[in-house]
């Protein structure tokens, strides 16, 4: 499922997005955000993060730099014992 979603996103980025123009209010475009979210968190959770991001893409949101949240199991400890 993850591979299919990533292929669909790649298709969108190469063939559909250039026709629509560059009008994203966020630094990572929604399609880049979706690719990163799906790669990091899998298809279900990645789609959930993507859905929440697309909901934010509206005139009342300032936009800016928005990254995919890192899950606790994927993060590395900040303090290492020596």
UniProtKB/Swiss-Prot annotation:
It comes from the Bacteria. It is a peripheral membrane protein. It comes from Rickettsia peacockii (strain Rustic). Keywords: Cell inner membrane, Cell membrane, Membrane. It is found in: Cell inner membrane. One of its GO terms (cellular component) is plasma membrane. It holds the Pfam family YidD. Could be involved in insertion of integral membrane proteins into the membrane. Belongs to the UPF0161 family. This is Putative membrane protein insertion efficiency factor. Coiled coil: none annotated. InterPro entries: Membr_insert_effic_factor_YidD.
């Amino acid at each position: 499922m993850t591979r299919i979603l990533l292929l669909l996103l790649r298709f969108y980025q190469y063939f559909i997005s250039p026709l629509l123009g560059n009008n994203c209010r966020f630094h990572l475009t929604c399609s880049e955000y979706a690719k990163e979210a799906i790669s990091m968190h899998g298809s279900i959770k990645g789609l959930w993060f993507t859905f929440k991001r697309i909901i934010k893409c509206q005139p009342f949101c300032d936009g800016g730099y928005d990254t995919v949240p890192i899950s606790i199991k994927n993060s590395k400890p900040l303090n290492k014992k020596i």
